[in-house]
A protein has these predicted regions:
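Extended, structured, electrostatic nucleic-acid-contact surfaces
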Residues: 64-70
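Low-complexity segments
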Residues: 99-160
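C-terminal segment of classical bacterial N-terminal signal peptides
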Residues: 14-21
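Acidic, glycine-anchored loop motifs typical of Ca2+
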Residues: 70-82
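Basic, polyanion-binding surface patches
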Residues: 94
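Bacterial N-terminal signal peptides that target proteins for export
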Residues: 1-8
Length: 160
């Protein structure tokens, strides 16, 4: 009886090995240079922001594993850091902060996106790199050919 139990246990373990291997999938970081600011291009961040329909999709675009545009490893664990997106708003101004998740409840600001609509309904977007990573006054002001859909998400009607 003991041998039958061990045989079934061994056989069951063999079937579980492929699933365990898939659960431990990691992404290896290969730094493009010693300058960490080159591992996240803020022009690409501005482009992805303009392509997103809302902040949830923007966060998903930032963290797409198949794209090699984000290669940040700020905590040095050998894996690409997940980038989370948080937002605060005040009237016609929105602040979107991109943070690298370093550990549980530990975050590092990477960039901020200021979105503001003036009295003439003109929207200004500024992507500002964190001073620690990008140096002082690293600001990108994207010009979009078409109005990004995310503007509607910021100022469109909302239903509760």
């Amino acid at each position: 009886m003991k041998r039958v139990f061990l045989f079934i246990l061994t056989l069951g373990s063999l079937f579980m090995v492929p699933y365990a291997a898939m659960a431990d999938e990691t992404v290896t970081v290969t730094a493009t240079s010693s300058d960490i600011s080159e591992n996240l291009d803020l022009k690409t961040v501005a482009t992805l922001f303009g392509q997103a329909k809302d902040l949830e999709q923007f966060e998903a675009l930032l963290n797409t594993p198949d794209s090699a545009f984000s290669n940040l490893d700020l905590n040095g664990d050998g894996e690409v850091d997940y980038l989370r997106v948080i937002e605060t708003a005040d009237d016609n101004r929105h602040l979107v902060v991109i943070q690298a998740v370093l550990a549980k409840d530990i975050y590092q600001d990477v960039a901020s996106i200021f979105v503001e609509k003036d009295a003439n309904n003109q929207v200004t977007v500024q992507v500002i790199g964190d001073e620690y990573i990008y140096g002082a006054d690293y600001i990108i002001e994207p010009v979009y050919i078409y109005q990004p859909v995310i503007y509607d998400w910021f100022w469109g009607p909302s239903w509760v």
